[in-house]
Every structure is written in structure tokens, then in C-alpha cells.
Amino acid sequence: MNYNQWIKNAKQKMSAQGYEENAVEWLVMDMCQWSRTQMILNEKDVLSQDRLKQLEQGLSFLLKGMPVQYVVEQAHFYGRIFKVNPNVLIPRPETEEVVHYFLNQIRPTMTVADVGVGSGIIAVTLKAEINDLTVYGSDISKSALSVAQNNAKKHNCEIHFMEGDALKPYIEQGIQLEGLISNPPYISKEEVNVMGKDVLEFEPHLALFAEEQGYQVYKALIRDLPAVMCDGAPVVFEIGYQQGEFLTQLMQTWFPHIKTQVIDDINGQPRIFTFNWHKI
């Protein structure tokens, strides 16, 4: 059997169970370490027994609904490849827009933090793009921090990792930040019914769901900003498409002197909640 025949057969199996066929191609490219062009050029090659066994095992996971990124244990983000596993979220394309916006708000030599660092994709991307930054990454999950540390090492990026909830570790260590970015858990428990089966079954709920209709972590972050933020520091949150109005009202209530902004993503959905911190 050659690669083209195997891919065609695997796609038919995926389609029959209602799964995305393109995951098969990603499986082949990642396991063979091929580009799409290389996959096309090699499609007539006969599979070795070892490769066939490897691909069949991967396909068996795909047919159970497991996202291909977890099957191959890696995901692409901002032009780089990162290690992922079920202890961390799979990077979303929309988050690249959030990171791109933040990168345009900061300057080299700043001290910045990624709160809720997860797999480390944001923190590592910041350091890789602007090497002179001092970057902190914090998370409440030990398992997630382990993945983030591996990704920082993989990309030769020095990140200062800390375990803790929201801004508590920064307050405890007296760290002052000149920039803050966070993609925290922001899905409410009430939204479980509209979530994809693959997300609910395989991605970590600790990184997905938050109490108080999804606003718990945002409130904790915003409440403690006065203790850690330097004057003029940019703050950037990734948000759900329905959360911009509430967060705008919350900031107007707690810190009425701060001007906030909600920015849409490429699909026209509210994605970024941002402002520059100013002391009263």
C-alpha cells in the first residue's frame, strides 16, 4: 500500500464517522515530518510496516475523536511548532491575532507576563519575537507549567515560570509589570451544551471553564492590577465573543479613569479586550 492509498482509505473512515478528513493529512505530515509538498511528492511510495503500524495507531485515536494535535503531540503557532498534550489547550488561530496585537503595544527591554501560560505558546512567542524582553509565565496547573518549560527549552527562550493563581505570584514576589497578556479560562459552565465533543472530552476543563459566568479569572486579574502594573502598561485579554460589554462595564465601575477598547478578530468577532493601565 502506498501513502496515497492509505490516506484515501483513512479519509473514508473519518468521513463515515463524521470527523474532519483533513486531520488524516496532518497526521501523515507530522508523523513523517513532511511539508504538504513533500507529502504529494512521496504519495506513491510504499509504506513500511513500521510506518503503517504508526499511522494506523494514530488513525485509531482520530476515530475516537481525539484532536490530531494531541495524537502527534504538537501544534503550530505563529510559525513555530510547540509540544502539546491533554494537560494544555490546543492553540487557536485567533490567539495569534491577540499575540500580534500585544507585540505591537510593547517595546524591547520591557518586563511582561503571560498569565495562564498553559503550553507556553504566548510567552515563548513573545520572547522569540523580541529577545530583549523579560518574560514571566504563570499558571495554576503544575502539568501545564511542565509543558511550557519544555517548549521554552525547545525554542531556547528564557522564561521565568511561576506557579500560582492569577496575579498572586507577582504580588508575592513584588514583581512590577510593564505589560500583561492573558488568555484565561473564560467559558461559562452554562455553555457546555454548545461545546464540541472533541473539546469537552479531550481538552483540560481547568483551562476552559471559569465560574461567575466565565468572568472569575478576569475579575481576579483586574482587581489586582494596581498591585503589579506600571503606569502606562498595556493590558491585553483574549475574550469570548459575548464578553466585551460586561468587561467594559466592569472597568468603568472599578477603574472609571481607564479607557478600554474591544477589538474584533479576522472573523468579525470580538476577541481582544485591551487598555493601558494608569494609576489614579
Task: Please report, for each region that a protein language model flagged, where it lies by residue.
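S-adenosylmethionine
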Residues: 138-278
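Short clusters of hydrophobic/aromatic residues that line enzyme substrate/ligand-binding pockets
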Residues: 39, 47, 71-72, 195, ...
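Short, basic/glycine-rich phosphate-binding loops at helix/coil junctions
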Residues: 35, 78-81, 198-205
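A general structural motif
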Residues: 21, 109, 132, 174-177, ...
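N-terminal secretory/membrane-targeting helices
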Residues: 5, 11-14, 20, 32, ...
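N-terminal auxiliary segments of SAM/dcSAM-dependent transferases
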Residues: 1-70
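SAM-dependent Rossmann-like transferase core, predominantly class I methyltransferases
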Residues: 56-131, 135-147, 271-274
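Alpha-helical elements of Rossmann-like donor-binding domains used by nucleotide-donor carbohydrate transfer enzymes
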Residues: 9, 26, 54-57, 97, ...
